[in-house]
């Protein structure tokens, strides 16, 4: 009985310190990456380790960091049009989108719709693992609040565009632009930006270099949304360029 109690005390002692250590690393990451380029994300680490564990040693999770000044404004506009049109005005969470998604998911349990903002996706991609769980979602909420508190909207968008997954081993808009269009991210056209944004829901299934009918349809929808938002003027009006 005493040995069991000692074992539980040992687990509690070290478990508590592990949690404190992880939280401290997250807080440090939020502060550091408010200014410095992000060298890698947790999703990149997860993909790389997954490849190695399956014996694929040729896989390389590749990303090339570029500042917002070297990213086409069409790309920033495209991801907002596709993923989070209220990004400039919300505080990390789109309550209306959450309520709409909950109502949709109750009616269509086989077709789950998400409501994650760009801020939430940035927090998840940077600090957390992939997949769906209430634990991960709870951690995501806290990290999103921290990011919104410390980072500017422009910084959130910059980090998002540099760590988003656009294909197998392709992370960040610079790597995606060079891989799919043989050009830097600064030269992306509206159509090319919309195509990259169209694969974001599932970049391992949807291909920018071999777009399905669904991807092309989504690309055209994103282009219409970009125009309705006001084009590049929307970026400038919200100090995101």
From Swiss-Prot:
Pathway(s) where this gene product acts: Cell wall biogenesis; peptidoglycan biosynthesis
UniProt keyword list: Cell inner membrane, Cell membrane, Cell shape, Cell wall biogenesis/degradation, Glycosyltransferase, Membrane, Peptidoglycan synthesis, Transferase, Transmembrane, Transmembrane helix
Family the UniProt entry places it in: Belongs to the glycosyltransferase 51 family.
Taxonomic placement: Bacteria, Pseudomonadati, Pseudomonadota, Gammaproteobacteria, Enterobacterales
Species this protein is from: Yersinia enterocolitica serotype O:8 / biotype 1B (strain NCTC 13174 / 8081)
Name of the featured protein: Biosynthetic peptidoglycan transglycosylase
Transmembrane segments: 18-38
EC number: 2.4.99.28
Disulfide bond sites: none
Role according to the record: Peptidoglycan polymerase that catalyzes glycan chain elongation from lipid-linked precursors.
């Amino acid at each position: 009985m005493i040995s069991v109690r000692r074992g539980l005390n040992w687990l509690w002692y070290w478990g508590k310190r592990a949690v404190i250590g992880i939280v401290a690393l997250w807080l440090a990451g939020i502060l550091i990456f408010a200014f410095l380029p992000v060298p890698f994300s947790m999703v990149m680490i997860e993909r790389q380790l997954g490849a190695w564990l399956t014996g694929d040693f040729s896989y390389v999770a590749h990303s090339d960091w570029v500042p917002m000044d070297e990213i086409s404004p069409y790309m920033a506009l495209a991801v907002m049009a596709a993923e989070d049109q209220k990004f400039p005005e919300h505080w990390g969470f789109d309550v209306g989108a959450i309520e709409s998604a909950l109502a949709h998911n109750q009616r269509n349990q086989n077709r789950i719709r998400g409501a994650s903002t760009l801020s939430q996706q940035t927090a998840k991609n940077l600090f957390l693992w992939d997949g769906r769980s209430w634990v991960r979602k709870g951690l995501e909420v806290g990290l999103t609040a921290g990011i919104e508190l410390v980072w500017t909207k422009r910084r959130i968008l910059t980090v998002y565009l540099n760590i988003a997954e656009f294909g197998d081993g392709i992370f960040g808009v610079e790597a995606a632009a060079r891989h799919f269009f043989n050009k830097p991210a600064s030269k992306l056209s509206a159509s090319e930006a919309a195509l990259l944004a169209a694969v974001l829901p599932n970049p391992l299934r949807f291909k920018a270099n071999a777009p399905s009918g669904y991807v092309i349809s989504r690309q055209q929808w994103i282009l219409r949304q970009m125009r309705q938002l006001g084009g590049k003027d929307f970026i400038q009006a919200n100090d995101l360029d």
